[in-house]
């Protein structure tokens, strides 16, 4: 898949330099070409953008190499060498820790003006041990929509939603009030847990908070009893513990509110639903449940410096990938929610803009080092679905269950922050 970069003389010269321990001079990259690697959807769209406008960095051309799948792209990076690797790779935030450790990725220092185009949490996603390794590209998140044939205006609080459900459950034959259509009852439902006052971990100024518990069991239990349970401690049906059938029920008009994924928005648009996207509202007006809103990134590699194009590669990251114009040009083809704030107000689809704004308003990073659990604990992915089942199906005491979950979360946070 990679472009041949050297003739026989060039290879011999490079080998001699490597053996002698000398550093290759800038003239090493005589063609002034920046190579970008991407997957089967991002690659062709980036190529179209650069074919339309190729002068993002003076004195450099951009070559996009496309791989057959995201997995194939990751395998190629794993097998890349100084002669074959890219200068920039468009990949997952989860690649950053490994790439930083094995030296395939290189850190980049960005000005405060560039950083202001994104959220602090976006950069947390692309950081390891305090260093940033790329530029946020697009967001992977969920958000809530409401059926305008049932609900005439956006709810301001979770209580507004519950009240609507209770008042219209029988007359409109509603099967639930809010359900998870995209992302499941762990990843997709974090915003519901957060709207009720809990969290897998807390963030402040782009950092994990370690001196405050992620859950206050008393407060969470009180809110669950107020908004999800009846006087006898049984579920009102407003929020089901399972995501089974949610999407079909929402599309059929039997559920007024649904959390959907940004990968499936076309399904709803084709059925006539408006993309009135928003985070799940919290207990108080103006507060919102936080959803996981991790970003993919355009990542700088160490190969760029070895080939003498690091300056150009860094400029491309800033002038194209981190710019409003670049984000708009790219996302108008890619149709993913942009991470760059300026592009979130552009003339893109309502879904792209809506998901992007929801993530900016209430997105937190998906931190695997914390969420995946640690020795003597359990993973968030197992804990939250089990919690919903315990309090909404099995009738267990919300405070007791919240206390147990909080204790596991604290163990996961304490262990996870050591590898960030």
Question: Which role does the model predict for each range below?
Answer:
Residues 133-137, 142, 162-211, 255:
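Extracytoplasmic/periplasmic solute-binding protein
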Residues 130, 270-334:
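Extracytoplasmic/periplasmic substrate-recognition and gating elements
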Residues 86-87, 115-149, 287-291, 366-374:
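A structural signal for short loop-to-beta-strand junctions that line the ligand-binding cleft
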Residues 93-141, 153-154, 158-160, 278:
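Hinge/lid segment of periplasmic solute-binding proteins
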């Amino acid at each position: 898949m990679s472009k041949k970069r050297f003739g026989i003389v060039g290879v011999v010269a490079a080998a001699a330099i490597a053996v002698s321990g000398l550093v290759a001079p800038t003239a090493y990259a005589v063609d002034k070409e920046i190579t970008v690697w991407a997957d089967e959807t991002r690659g062709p769209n980036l190529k179209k953008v650069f074919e339309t406008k190729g002068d993002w960095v003076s004195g450099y051309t951009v070559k996009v190499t496309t791989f057959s799948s995201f997995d194939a792209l990751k395998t190629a990076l794993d097998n890349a060498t100084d002669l074959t690797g890219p200068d920039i790779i468009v990949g997952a935030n989860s690649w950053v820790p490994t790439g930083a450790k094995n030296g395939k990725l290189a850190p980049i220092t960005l000005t405060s003006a560039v950083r202001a185009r994104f959220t602090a949490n976006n950069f947390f996603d692309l950081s390891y041990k305090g260093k940033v390794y790329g530029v946020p590209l697009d967001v992977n998140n969920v958000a809530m929509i409401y059926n305008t044939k049932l609900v005439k205006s956006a709810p301001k609080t979770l209580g507004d939603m519950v009240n609507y459900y209770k008042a219209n459950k029988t007359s409109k034959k509603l099967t639930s009030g809010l359900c998870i259509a995209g992302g499941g009852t762990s990843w997709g439902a974090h915003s519901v847990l957060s709207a009720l006052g809990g969290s897998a971990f807390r963030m402040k100024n782009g950092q994990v908070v370690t001196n405050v518990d992620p859950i206050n069991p008393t407060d969470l239990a009180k809110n669950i009893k107020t908004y999800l349970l009846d006087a006898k401690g049984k579920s009102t049906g407003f929020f089901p513990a399972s995501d089974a059938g949610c999407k079909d029920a929402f599309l059929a008009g039997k559920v007024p509110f649904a959390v959907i994924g940004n990968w499936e928005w076309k399904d709803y648009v084709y059925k006539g639903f408006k993309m009135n996207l928003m985070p799940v509202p919290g207990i108080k007006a103006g507060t919102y449940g936080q959803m996981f809103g991790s970003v993919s990134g355009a990542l700088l590699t160490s190969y760029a410096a070895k080939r003498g194009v690091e300056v150009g590669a860094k400029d491309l990251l800033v002038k194209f990938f981190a710019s409003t114009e670049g984000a708009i040009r790219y996302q108008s083809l890619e149709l993913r929610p942009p991470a760059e704030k300026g592009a979130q107000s552009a003339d893109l689809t309502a879904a792209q803009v809506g998901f992007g704004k929801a993530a900016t308003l209430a997105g937190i990073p998906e931190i695997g080092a914390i969420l995946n659990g640690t020795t003597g604990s359990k993973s968030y992915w197992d804990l939250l679905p089990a919690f919903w089942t315990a309090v909404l199906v099995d009738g267990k005491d919300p405070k007791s269950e919240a206390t147990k979950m909080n204790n596991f979360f604290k163990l996961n946070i304490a262990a996870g922050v050591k590898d960030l």
